[in-house]
Amino acid sequence: DALGTHTHGTKNLAGYIKKAHDGGVSLTAKPEILKQGSAYALIDGHAALGMVTSTFAMELACDKAEQEGVALCVVKNSCHFGAAGYYANLAAKRGMIGISMSNVDPNMTIPGARGMVIGNNPLAYAAPAQSTPSVFLDVAMSNVASLKVIQAKKDGKEIPATWIVDKDGVPTTDPSHYPEEGAMQPMAAHKGYGLALLVELLSGILSGGSTSMSGE
């Protein structure tokens, strides 16, 4: 919220509380390092809040990078972590280039398909700068954040035809199609799909965690 990204702030608090009550999130779990070397680590979040595990992972990556010049930490068994850019900026504040990403549940279609095929997996980077806080980018691989579609539905407003498709894969301006039967449109068509797949490989496969295809 402080960064102006209201779709990823306190607006999600009720959802986090419900998920905790339903057993999908542990409010007492602590991230555990399963395996590590001087410049890498594999972390199990044990279903803790994504903010807890992701902050732990980025701080650990920065600690290792201070010694080795570069480091990678991957996380499995985590939950929604909010805005990806927050964690990238943790590295920038320590004088480093930070990259953060996460795969999410399927909510986006891909060219030539119908329905939700893959997540709109967010990716962010931040680099320290002299005249500004950081050189910074935080984007999902859909044309717009899914929460903006949901907000438009609550407000009864139409949306641009580039945001979602209906159950037949046809672009629509009616937000009521999502998420019950429609899907998000990928940013720049196959390009957004390709980048979402990269995040899937690095976040889900590399960590040994869940992927969009885990339930198939």
What are these model-predicted stretches?
Residues 14-18, 59-62, 89-92, 126, ...:
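Predominant activation on well-ordered alpha-helical scaffold segments within soluble catalytic domains
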Residues 8-62:
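Active-site cofactor/substrate anionic-group-binding motifs, chiefly glycine-
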Residues 38-130:
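A generic, well-ordered mixed alpha/beta core segment in the N-terminal half of proteins
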Residues 171-211:
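Oxyanion-binding "anion nests"
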Residues 8-15, 52-56, 60, 82, ...:
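Conserved active-site and cofactor/substrate-binding residues in soluble primary-metabolism enzymes
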Residues 108-177:
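Phosphate/diphosphate-binding glycine-rich loops and adjacent basic-rich segments that engage nucleotide
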Residues 213-216:
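Catalytic-core signal marking the mid-to-C-terminal active-site face
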Residues 1-5, 18-25, 63-67, 93-97, ...:
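Generic secondary-structure signature for well-ordered alpha-helical cores
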